[in-house]
From Swiss-Prot:
Native organism: Saccharomyces cerevisiae (strain AWRI1631) (Baker's yeast)
Record-level GO cellular component terms: mitochondrion
InterPro entries reported for this sequence: ATPase_expression_mit (IPR024319)
Record-given protein name: ATPase expression protein 2, mitochondrial
Gene this chain is encoded by: AEP2
Subunit organization: Binds to the 5'UTR of the OLI1 mRNA.
Amino acid sequence: MWINRLVKHPSYSVLRFYTKRLCTVSVKSLREFGVLPNSTICHSVYPRRTYVMGRAVINDILIKKSYSTHTVCAIDRSKDENNGSAYDKFEAKGIPIDVHTLKRIISSSGMDESEFSKSISYLFAKTVDPEPKDVLSLEDLSFLLSKLYTQRFQIRRICRDINAKYSEFWFKLFSLYAEKVDAKRNQVNLRNTKLDACEIFDANLMIKNFIELGQLGKAQKILSFILDRNPDILLSPKNADISTIVHFLQLRCGALAPYWKIPDNSEQKQGFLRKMVRLGAKNTSIRLSSTYKAMDHQTLLKIADLALQEKKLLNSEDLLSTLIQSFGHLGQTQILERCIEHIWQISPQEFPSHVVIKHRGCYPSSKILVSILVSFYFNDHDLHRGLSILDSFIKHYPDVKLDALFWRRLFQLSHFAWTPANDKKATSVVRCWHLMKQWYASKRLRPSVDYETLRQLYDIMKKTGNFPLGIDVLRSFKPGIERTRAENAGKVNNIIIKYQKCIIKELVNRGRFSAVREFIDNYGFDRKMTKDLNIFCANRMFLRSKKMKNKIENKKEREKVRLDSFDDDEDDGMIIGSLW
């Protein structure tokens, strides 16, 4: 069919027709596979690789340039042959970035702009396209940026090894990227020349990376870079970008809950002020900046007004979650309650269970419920109102999925709210533990192992001496612990050993030796650990017997001293009586 059409056209129009046809088919196929959206206005609804790979494919078609790492062979396949994810069909099969190349590029971050640009070109040639290039295009740098982000943990380790600043490397990379963005527009009327969807996504990717590093100042500069060039990106119904709004709420409206200072009642001592802790302080996957404050409260209300009207924004889980946290940080709990009622029809006034309610936004998720819990606790310093609303969500939205982060935050907050003087057995925390077990049992699921959750429950067990709680925790998490140990998770393994030793110590001290043997048999997990626990148990039993022996001997000694003292008093009495 194509041949017949080509024959009918004169030779000078064949190439034009072929190019037009191939572009049309390519774009159509990309849309069918979910790689290219029907409209590229809604920037952040689709992932960055949607725009990067889509733009790269079309660019290859138009200028006849084929990257050695781009595989576009699946464009004209039938739908039946494409059962995998859309990205798999266009995934870049690039060479992994080796350590030597990474060290060279990271070391160059301390050089001037030209030397750093040359190192980036060398890195691109080593990992993406072996064709030498003096200057990388913006598309090349965008593709390389995504590849570097996927290997950011390896890059961070290399930075530690060579004593280089990881954050400075990324900020130098952003400076180079911003320079190319400006050069693309020939530095003409930059404030009125908007960034395209891919450039916005790249900038937001770097903001996300700097937030993870706790480099909020650098993240603010990149956010300003976006806002200066796209001033309507926050409040325009047509051009609003979800990722940019989320980062604006996080950086300027207080929606970074891990930074919030929460009062810890469990560590309060009589006559002293309550200790203030941050929720993310024990999290090793992110770093926290030393300072954090919200700066823009007026724009928050405008964003909320837009979000409650636009369906696209209401369907964004990330946006609603950060919006809730912003209201919580601002202390506007009444506005927060009205927003929850407007979006999900959940009110502090309990609805009858038979009432059918419909949500106007996305279906509630763990991220949203965590934001609600943390926001109310931040203002109330107790969990009463947050748990009441949570109970309504679970009742009216039975399909809500509660992940490990939700339970981690619930145990953290319940632990912080626990006052030992009023509740010596921490019944509020134990109640949350039973709630978690009941939820997983109702869904016929096994709880996933989370280090922070295990640590919180271990602290409660140790402070209250509630070793049955520890045994129950190990019993519930046993399948997940066995799987995690097979993956050689060091932190989880260490906290499990603490559980085991604490429980064995309590059982030995109470003289329940048969229970100790049964515990080791059930929760030894492997031969080496069982051997170590038996040795620890034997040592504890030896110490206990030695302590008991010393206690008996001391008791006998005290009894002997008491009898000798009584005999001396009796002799003195007889002497005094005879003299009298």
